[in-house]
Amino acid sequence: MAIELLTPFTKVELEVEKKETNRKQVGILGGNFNPVHNAHLIVADQVRQQLQLDEVLLMPEFIPPHVDKKETIDEYHRYSMLKMAIAGIEGLGIETIELERRGVSYTYDTMKLLKEKNPDTDYYFIIGADMVDYLPKWHKIDELVTMVQFVGVQRPRYKAGTSYPVIWVDVPLMDISSSMVRDFIKQGRVPNFMIPHEVLDYI
């Protein structure tokens, strides 16, 4: 399957292949999921299908390293809503390592632990185009890129380029964010079709 790799200077096509048939291919979509919304699910599902991954795990952060004093729903509720949101969806799961470890959720530390725990798994770390621009500031980024393959997905109003190796995947653009969902709820508006109905009922 031909996948585009974009840098500020070049645009080439790569043939993405399974490295070894006996190795598991797993995508990781990290986030606060505050709350989870339909764009999260579309991104996870489309990356899984297009890169032919075995599964994509949604990984809720305990404390995001890049956000200051962000109002965050209790981790129990964020996990419960994620569990409801992915119920019955093929190839999607939840990775709770950062909730269990607690503290600031640095991706390098998390992926180091996951690689040690699952040495026969190749990880694809999924990020939005806005986070691609931020990659140079990530904790131990040069070591991290040797541990995972970054996968970038386009977001409305963001056009990104980077010198780091990123596989770009086209997904339907949905301008939905967790903060938008929270604002709707604060204003007394119902975020129909923005979040799974089970999550809406839970809220």
What positions do the PLM features span?
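Nucleotidyltransferase catalytic core that binds NTPs
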Residues: 1-202
